[in-house]
Amino acid sequence: MQMMTRKVLLNMELEEDDDEDGDIVLENFDQTIVCPTFGSLENQQDFRTPEFEEFNGKPDSLFFTDGQRRIDFILVYEDESKKENNKKGTNEKQKRKRQAYESNLICHGLQLEATRSVSDDKLVFVKVHAPWEVLCTYAEIMHIKLPLKPNDLKTRSPFGNLNWFTKVLRVNESVIKPEQEFFTAPFEKSRMNDFYILDRDSFFNPATRSRIVYFILSRVKYQVMNNVNKFGINRLVSSGIYKAAFPLHDCRFNYESEDISCPSERYLLYREWAHPRSIYKKQPLDLIRKYYGEKIGIYFAWLGYYTQMLLLAAVVGVACFLYGYLDQDNCTWSKEVCDPDIGGQILMCPQCDRLCPFWRLNITCESSKKLCIFDSFGTLIFAVFMGVWVTLFLEFWKRRQAELEYEWDTVELQQEEQARPEYEAQCNHVVINEITQEEERIPFTTCGKCIRVTLCASAVFFWILLIIASVIGIIVYRLSVFIVFSTTLPKNPNGTDPIQKYLTPQMATSITASIISFIIIMILNTIYEKVAIMITNFELPRTQTDYENSLTMKMFLFQFVNYYSSCFYIAFFKGKFVGYPGDPVYLLGKYRSEECDPGGCLLELTTQLTIIMGGKAIWNNIQEVLLPWVMNLIGRYKRVSGSEKITPRWEQDYHLQPMGKLGLFYEYLEMIIQFGFVTLFVASFPLAPLLALVNNILEIRVDAWKLTTQFRRMVPEKAQDIGAWQPIMQGIAILAVVTNAMIIAFTSDMIPRLVYYWSFSIPPYGDHTYYTMDGYINNTLSVFNITDFKNTDKENPYIGLGNYTLCRYRDFRNPPGHPQEYKHNIYYWHVIAAKLAFIIVMEHIIYSVKFFISYAIPDVSKITKSKIKREKYLTQKLLHESHLKDLTKNMGIIAERIGGTVDNSVRPKLE
């Protein structure tokens, strides 16, 4: 054995490298000892292994066999001596590493006890307990804030009891009692007497105990190879030495614990939060935070607040929808489309070459009626409202978040975030720190960093191009399938087909393309999730926060393009660059550009949003409910059955599903994408907030059900806010103003109708003596001479036209015979000017209101600021008085000693 005298680096190699020979590291409080791995285990006398104890038959016990020491963490491994395969002595090597790790845990002060599984003799459960001294030591290291004295400030609303009509929505306080609140301060062992310690067993709650133990487990070494340390429970689990590591749930979710001292918080959460009968109740956020930690608590607080705000948006959206629905009868332009004497007499030009027939305008009657619902004045009002709503939501959430920071004691979260082991493992370059002028190690030079950033950016850009390619593929599909559906129209324009009344070629194409687009989106999401993690790992961020933020931006950028690209195409590109029947625009030189319905592409955008948003919500909820439930069901069938066997708490939890390394990352991502649908394209679909509201009400309870019933308990983590998702939402809110203004201007037909009503229905352009919408359809569909088709030299595929020599198409162009035939007419330029003016005015109005609201509403309320300042003052005063009391006491003792010394020295002289 030899003493390690120099600092060694971390190593995060591939999992299979853990099977290589290296030196086992054993630690005690005075030194680190390195033991060669060769030789028999009998010769290794330095291992301090946990004692094996038999299960005491108490299924709800959270303690060691002695019933005194609480279980703070569970480690699970498969007994190496009972494994069937032992390739190249792998089992022996893994056993040495595990024993060295457990020995080092004991050297760090943790207490271990091992118990074999009651259902599978191969499995061994190692129970970990942190004694008082260890908890105090690491609480000081981790800057954990602990109670000083009960808080005399009221943090809850003083009007809460007056809201008797909302009592049914509140948490039952007789079941979930309000938590006692305290003034807190970072723990210091030297000031232990200042803290509110009534009972050592309850001073550190189970969540804090688990967090401290996990901090130790993540940093204890077990092997050194080539002067490189290997350590941490995460690496041991990933390499298969341990099968799992997790804190315990405190009881079964559907029954209270038999132990009367157990608070059964998991059962309370299931009953008052996750159970379907509690779907209408507010969330017990304080208990969620206490049981799962602040990071989980802040997610559910944010999701709940977002859902509450959606209620207002949903009500206004439904009102606008009903306005459009009830106003259908006053929709003049739709009546003209459906009128046999107007729409029935208008012959529309073919929308593709040769194969597509001429068609009557009135076959779009039903779609025009549906379009009246969404393309109404109420839509404009709703778009403006949503621009203000999203600002109110973000500003009030900041205030709510500040309140939670105060209530949950995370205002001054003191967490010195350590570098990720994966980062330190690559620190091979030595540089001089410009500030400290000391040597420090970094993973790569400036040139190497530039290369990595370039490669990562190129990879992300490549995948974005792949999405764009898939969108182009969908466009080609739409063009091809539209031709197929158009050929089903009767060649004789006077013919009829019952299905055409409800399903036009454009609508059929839109529905099928939306479904295919949704499937492609789901497939690309599945692939890119793995690719994004690989890219971020290669990028090598320094801290876990940096890692999550980098991954967040990559995933959101990809998801943004993936989910919204098809919507942007329909809203802003489809039907905008089509030319006219005599000179159409071709995509890729082959496919004729898509055209919109005579009423515009707004209804198609609504269809796209409904299918993608609704399909995504249904798919995610099915996946979140069914997948963990099925996996747990399969696991139960695989286990040895036997109703006579009593299963301990740790074994019950082991058979639950593990939570992913990224925790609630994908839950946040799902909600942010939904937030984008609700805000970016809401002008085309006022029912989007209602769908989001219904989905979120279910989402909260589904996530709660998963956490409490299907997943192991997560290690509690601290968090002040929702992290990088806040600026992402702010960016979406700014972009939403532009997209909704452009949807109303360029996708809907609201501006052309207003221009016709105010300018072209009366002289000098119109024939009416008063403002009216009569004649809108006839005056806004351009005329084309059938003889001007470019393929007139070929056999004419159209029959049954009778005396028709003209057809109509959607555009604002001069008629044949005009000096500037088929050029844009004066109406077109009036409409363009009106659209641009509308966008500028709407954006400036909404942005002005947004900035005023942001300025007028402070991020932290005055009451919360006062509470924070008063708590700081009282905490400092309390610590100062305590310190002064100790100082006075010590000075008194010193004075007495000095006085005694003086008396002894003076007394002989007096004699």
From Swiss-Prot:
Transmembrane segments in this chain: where? 302-322, 377-397, 457-477, 511-531, 553-573, 603-622, 665-685, 686-706, 724-744, 838-858
Q: What is the effect of changing F518L?
A: Decreased lipid scramblase activity
Quick one: effect of changing G615A?
A: Requires lower calcium levels for activation of scramblase and ion channel activity
Taken from the record's topology, the Extracellular segments are 323-376, 478-510, 574-602, 745-837
Q: What is the effect of changing F518A?
A: Increased speed of phospholipid scrambling. Constitutive scramblase activity at basal cytosolic calcium levels
Upon changing E667Q, the result is: Requires much higher calcium levels for the activation of scramblase and ion channel activity
Q: Which reactions is this enzyme annotated as catalysing?
A: a 1,2-diacyl-sn-glycero-3-phospho-L-serine(in) = a 1,2-diacyl-sn-glycero-3-phospho-L-serine(out); a beta-D-galactosyl-(1<->1')-N-acylsphing-4-enine(out) = a beta-D-galactosyl-(1<->1')-N-acylsphing-4-enine(in); a 1,2-diacyl-sn-glycero-3-phosphocholine(in) = a 1,2-diacyl-sn-glycero-3-phosphocholine(out)
> Where found in the cell?
Cell membrane
Tissue specificity statement from the Swiss-Prot or TrEMBL entry: Predominant expression seen in epithelial tissues. Also found in skeletal system where it is primarily expressed in osteoblasts.
Q: Which domain of life is it from?
A: Eukaryota
In the UniProt record, does the keyword Calcium occur? yes
Glycan-modified residues? N330, N362, N494, N778, N785, N803
Consequence of substituting I521A:
Does not induce a constitutive phospholipid scramblase activity
Q: What is its main location?
A: membrane
Q: How does it sit in the membrane?
A: Multi-pass membrane protein
Tell me the impact of changing K370A: No effect on lipid scramblase activity
Q: Name one GO cellular component term.
A: chloride channel complex
Write out the GO biological process terms: bleb assembly; blood coagulation; bone mineralization involved in bone maturation; calcium activated galactosylceramide scrambling; calcium activated phosphatidylcholine scrambling; calcium activated phosphatidylserine scrambling; calcium activated phospholipid scrambling; calcium ion transmembrane transport
Q: How is its activity regulated?
A: Exhibits synergistic gating by Ca(2+) and voltage. Inhibited by some non-specific cation channel blockers such as: ruthenium red, 2-aminoethyl diphenylborinate (2APB), gadolinium and cadmium ions.
Per the UniProt entry, the effect of F518 to E/K/Q is: Constitutive phospholipid scramblase activity at basal cytosolic calcium levels
Instruction: Fill in the subunit field for this protein.
Output: Homodimer.
Other notes on this protein? The term 'anoctamin' was coined because these channels are anion selective and are predicted to have eight (OCT) transmembrane segments. There is some dissatisfaction in the field with the Ano nomenclature because it is not certain that all the members of this family are anion channels or have the 8-transmembrane topology.
**UniProt name for this protein:** Anoctamin-6
- Species assigned in the record: Mus musculus (Mouse)
Lineage of producing organism: Eukaryota, Metazoa, Chordata, Craniata, Vertebrata
